[in-house]
């Protein structure tokens, strides 16, 4: 019974970032949501960025060879990362505001609707996601570069 529970938790935490990524794609397909709630989309991008950042920070820490990590410890670390991400999601770190400001500047310059801007952004995010799946540090650096082009 307990192994099934831990397997469920482990699988659930591994695909958390994929779920957030898929939510972004679903929002792209839902035109009403993307037109009226661009701030919600930027909050989801901020949430995804925070989750990637926290998990990569944990991976970069030194691990002692004498202290082996058990499966339950990795589950706990993933759950802790999710909790910290959810805590920062409520308050935010200001990235969503920056994205909204960049979208407004871009929108004013190009006279585009929120849907057109989100299409351009999500297409960049999709190509970014499919091309870079192995290197964690490059993922964070390229994600930050992606925000410059909004």
From Swiss-Prot:
* UniProt GO BP: bacterial-type flagellum organization
Does the record bear Coiled coil in its keywords?
A: no
* Signal sequence residues: none
Q: Name one Pfam family in it.
A: Rod-binding
Q: Which UniProt keywords apply?
A: Bacterial flagellum biogenesis
InterPro entries attached here?
A: Flagellar_prot_FlgJ_N (IPR019301)
| Ranges that cross the membrane | none
Report if keyword Acetylation is assigned. Answer: no
- Look up the further comments and give them: This protein is shorter than other FlgJ proteins and lacks the muramidase domain. It may be degenerating and may no longer be functional.
Please state which protein family the record places this protein in.
Belongs to the FlgJ family.
Q: What is this protein called?
A: Putative flagellar protein FlgJ homolog
Organism field: Buchnera aphidicola subsp. Baizongia pistaciae (strain Bp)
Phylogenetic placement of the source organism: Bacteria, Pseudomonadati, Pseudomonadota, Gammaproteobacteria, Enterobacterales
The coding gene here is flgJ
